[in-house]
Amino acid sequence: MRALLDTSVLIALLDANHLQHPLCHRWLATQQDGWASCPITLNGCIRILSQPQYPNRLPMQTVVRGLQEAMAHPMHSFWPDAVNPLAAHALDWQRLMRPAEITDAYLLALAVQHQACLVTLDQGISLAWVQGATAAHLQVLV
């Protein structure tokens, strides 16, 4: 099953000093079905890694080049943000409790739409947020 990498995983892959850098690289090396990115995860990665407040800040151009190189790999697919979060079959708004959960729920819905799994470092994502999501649609790296 192809994997949509969330922003936290992309950051860990690009930041050699990130605590989860080795874990994410080991996981990626075993991923045989390929991986995907989307505008939300790419923009989030660029924004966070290039912020002056980020502990291992990288110049924006360096982050962009790193992502471009990774995306050139034949195992990569780019997915446009194509889920309507307000559609009746997408997010379960009754189960979302905090605004901070919306992006994670959206990314999970995008993975479900592509019959893929969302790969994250975030242990707080609930399958109940997305209609049709099963355990196969979410992988938390720990």
What are these regions, as identified by a protein language model?
Residues G34, M75-S77, A136-Q139:
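Conserved beta-strand segments of alpha/beta enzyme cores
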Residues T41-L42:
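Short, conserved alpha-helical segments within structured domains
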Residues H73-Q123:
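Active-site neighborhoods of divalent-metal-dependent phosphate/nucleic-acid chemistry enzymes
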Residues Q53-P55, M97, A136-L138:
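Short, hinge-like loop/turn segments at secondary-structure boundaries
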Residues M1-S37, L49-R65, V130-A133:
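Short, well-structured N-terminal submotif of metal-dependent ribonuclease cores
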Residues Q113, C117-V119, Q123-V142:
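Charged phosphate-binding loop/patch that engages nucleotide di/tri-phosphates or the phosphate backbone
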